[in-house]
């Protein structure tokens, strides 16, 4: 089981996290922007973990986890339209839970201020990698990107997650795809942190995905169930998604 950790020298948060990991685990470092990387730039691995900054208009301190991909024709931030990378729900959720656990310890010890810890929905490149891919990010401004403690939290969480994956030291739970809600997937983040599910792909309300993309979501991830944020999903999308799940033998549930 090979994990490739990827960092960019052009990304302050990426360098911060990598500096706290390199003593314990090899990191693939590049002078390219992370979002410009393709499969040809990376050696083969069973899992790809990108160490990255997160940017937002609100500039709210945050620690986030998500799989990359373009759910619609919009490929403003690179990659191919309507293409997603493979995803592992266990990997994504263990990362989120470990980040939350370690952040909470640092916060209670007075080592770090308030940060939001959450999933993000599927977005941005790269889209063409052939193994499960995930971004772990520090946001949302330079102040947080270079914060030593934030880098330590992500680094520690990545290493703990790799150890758990390699030893299969994790509970068996339903692996789910989530549909609906906003960019930071609050409902699915909460359910994951409550140990209810392992979440992989998360599709927001604002992305009305096609059948082609739906097929990718169930073929590029091991899926046990689809969960629909009932109040956070458009009516016509709910109908289409449910019809697709039932036609493809995917159990679904409203939450």
Swiss-Prot record:
<keyword id="KW-0479">Metal-binding</keyword>
<dbReference type="GO" id="GO:0008270">
    <property type="term" value="F:zinc ion binding"/>
</dbReference>
<dbReference type="GO" id="GO:0019478">
    <property type="term" value="P:D-amino acid catabolic process"/>
</dbReference>
<comment type="function">
    <text>D-aminoacyl-tRNA deacylase with broad substrate specificity. By recycling D-aminoacyl-tRNA to D-amino acids and free tRNA molecules, this enzyme counteracts the toxicity associated with the formation of D-aminoacyl-tRNA entities in vivo.</text>
</comment>
<dbReference type="Pfam" id="PF04414">
    <property type="entry name" value="tRNA_deacylase"/>
</dbReference>
<dbReference type="InterPro" id="IPR018033">
    <property type="entry name" value="Deacylase_DtdA_archaea"/>
</dbReference>
<comment type="similarity">
    <text>Belongs to the DtdA deacylase family.</text>
</comment>
<comment type="subunit">
    <text>Monomer.</text>
</comment>
<keyword id="KW-0862">Zinc</keyword>
<dbReference type="InterPro" id="IPR007508">
    <property type="entry name" value="DtdA"/>
</dbReference>
<dbReference type="GO" id="GO:0051499">
    <property type="term" value="F:D-aminoacyl-tRNA deacylase activity"/>
</dbReference>
<protein>
    <recommendedName>
        <fullName>D-aminoacyl-tRNA deacylase</fullName>
        <ecNumber>3.1.1.96</ecNumber>
    </recommendedName>
</protein>
<keyword id="KW-0378">Hydrolase</keyword>
């Amino acid at each position: 089981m090979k994990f490739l950790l990827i960092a960019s020298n052009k990304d302050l948060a990426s360098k911060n996290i990598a500096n706290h990991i390199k003593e314990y685990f090899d990191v693939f470092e590049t002078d390219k922007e992370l979002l410009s990387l393709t499969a040809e730039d990376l050696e083969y691995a069973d899992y790809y973990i990108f160490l990255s900054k997160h940017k937002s208009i609100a500039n709210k301190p945050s620690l986030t986890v998500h799989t990359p991909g373009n759910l619609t024709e919009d490929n403003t931030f690179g990659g191919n339209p309507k293409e997603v990378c493979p995803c592992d729900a266990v990997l994504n959720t263990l990362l989120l839970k470990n980040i939350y656990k370690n952040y909470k310890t640092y916060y209670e010890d007075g080592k770090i201020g308030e940060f939001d810890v959450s999933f993000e929905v599927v977005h941005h490149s790269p889209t063409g990698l052939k193994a499960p891919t995930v971004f772990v990010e520090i946001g949302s401004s330079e102040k947080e990107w270079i914060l030593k403690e934030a880098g330590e939290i992500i680094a520690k969480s990545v290493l703990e997650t790799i150890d758990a994956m390699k030893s299969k030291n994790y509970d068996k739970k339903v692996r789910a795809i989530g549909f609906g809600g906003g960019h930071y997937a609050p409902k699915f983040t909460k359910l994951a942190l409550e140990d209810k599910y392992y979440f992989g792909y998360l599709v927001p309300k604002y992305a009305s995905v096609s059948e082609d993309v739906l097929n990718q979501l169930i073929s590029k991830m091991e899926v046990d169930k689809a969960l629909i944020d009932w109040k956070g999903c458009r009516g016509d999308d709910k109908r289409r998604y449910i019809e697709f799940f039932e036609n493809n033998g995917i159990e679904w549930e409203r939450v």
